[in-house]
Amino acid sequence: MSKVIYKNLNTSPILAVGGSGVWLEDAAGKRYLDTCGGVAVSSLGHAHPRIAAAFEREAKNLAWAHAGSFTTAAAEELATRLVDSSGGLARAQFLSGGSEVMELAMKIAYQYQSERGLPDKSIFISRRQSYHGSTLGTLSISGNVQRQSVFGRLLPPAEFVSPCYAYRDQRADESEDQYGTRLAQELDEKIRVLGSENVAAFFAETVVGSTNGAVPAVPGYFRKIKAVCERHDVLLILDEVMAGMGRTGHLYAYADDGIVPDMVAVGKGLAAGYMPISALLISERIHSAMAQGSGVLGNGQTHVNHPLACAIALEVQQVIREENLLAQVRQRGEQLRSWLKESLADLDIVGDIRGRGLFVGVEFVESRATKEPFHGAGAYAAALKQEALQRGLLIYPGSGTAQGLLGNHVLFAPPFITSEDELGQMVERFSAVVRAVAH
Ligand SMILES: Cc1ncc(COP(=O)(O)O)c(C=O)c1O
């Protein structure tokens, strides 16, 4: 009997033994086509020869050095690379997972306010229908009813405003611009009610990932939100743990929104899953307030700026740049959306297909005309996943798409290296899975 604690405590997962490109292989030799990079992680696929070579080279050089005493060329170079592409952020720190860097963002937001002599600026505002991590801090700002439910009593208080979810919430008599303005006014009002002297930061996923299924904001939304934050001296912190590092066709998803936040968190795709590594980038204003204040970052963890993880992430980023993969992500993304629309056009339960780059969501409804959220909930998501697995297809379904408990979606996040032929196979097989599962 296994000694491993699994997510599903009563069933064993499949034993994975290998992978190559967009394919994963189990112990019985069955191959699975990966439409979702696991959970938007494997952007370069499996067994990439350059990454394998980098492991051998770097592991022979230096495994680990404590960040309290040492820095490394890899950490310096990776930070410079990420900062230089950020459009205005100044410093980066590396941790192991998305929750950790989002928790760090919360701590730095408060440390910054406090060291400026504004310790009352301590309230965090986030959006409903969002996910920012599994620690108690990050879960408290996650507008994800399902993931919060067990731990509700333990969570510190946080405030929430509406998501930017045009498919469901933009009114028929409203333009995208008016919708964005209405949401910015809602945030403005929320801050006024709480008192801007009490609010530290506003958090948002640039493109909402697992909770809603690849939902980008309407054009102009983030510019208006940023203006509200600036007006009230509130930090704007973007969570791109899932959407960042090329997934939308830009290194940072906010490039499409025409803004630069005060902080951004990235994770999953940073080392394409070859290493557990994440990063938080912050502005010079925030860094210098702390540097000239206490001079000490109020957070310490064992694997800060892990040398080997940074070196592998750097090689991953180098491959993405040299192979011009972001352009490919944009092109394949358009193909994916248009092929999905074509192949699912006759299914009335497919309500919306949206996203950016290779970050695409399919939302299910009871009927296209009414947009009534699909009734299937968790059972439908599980059935889709099971059917797909049987057919050798890895998909990432979710439920609670609309208002936290209702509705279903599937998130596509295939590796950046996916060929046209492989993309076509993903769409074809997915269409067959949807048709095979009772609805
Ligand atoms: C947007 C977002 N933020 C934070 C996290 C947490 O990251 P991790 O699971 O690596 O801790 C996730 C994970 O799915 C995420 O999608």
Task: Give, region by region, the residue ranges found by the protein language model.
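Conserved N-terminal phosphate-binding loop of PLP-dependent enzymes in the Aspartate aminotransferase
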Residues: 1-439
